């Protein structure tokens, strides 16, 4: 199993996370300036919290194109997406 840092890129955008299929097999949600990300793999769900380092107001880009930095990634896998998202909510 990959470690948490290898699973989630340190820098990304919501659009790139979607392209990595986290959005189609999990969820990518903006919560203020935080991005809650849940992805699925064959053994379970994983989770990460990102923070926006650019805003649409600063860049003129859509929020999905703004740069993100990884804040924290769960080291464990979860039984379902709800538990993974609950982990994200507890870590913002």
Regions found by a protein language model. Give the residues of each.
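Negatively charged, low-complexity tracts enriched in Asp/Glu with abundant Ser/Thr
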Residues: 2-35
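Amphipathic, interaction-prone secondary-structure segments
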Residues: 25-52
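Short beta-strand segments and strand-loop junctions that repeat across beta-rich extracellular domains
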Residues: 48-62, 78
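A short, exposed loop/beta-hairpin motif centered on an aromatic-Gly-Thr core
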Residues: 61-81
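Short arginine-rich
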Residues: 90-92
């Amino acid at each position: 199993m990959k470690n948490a840092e290898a699973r989630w890129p340190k820098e990304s955008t919501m659009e790139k996370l979607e392209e990595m299929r986290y959005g189609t097999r999990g969820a990518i949600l903006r919560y203020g300036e935080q991005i809650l990300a849940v992805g699925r793999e064959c053994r379970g769900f994983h989770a990460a919290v990102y923070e926006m380092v650019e805003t649409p107001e600063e860049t003129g880009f859509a929020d999905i194109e703004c740069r993100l930095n990884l804040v924290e990634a769960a080291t464990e896998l979860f039984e379902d997406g709800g538990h993974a998202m609950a982990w994200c909510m507890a870590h913002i």
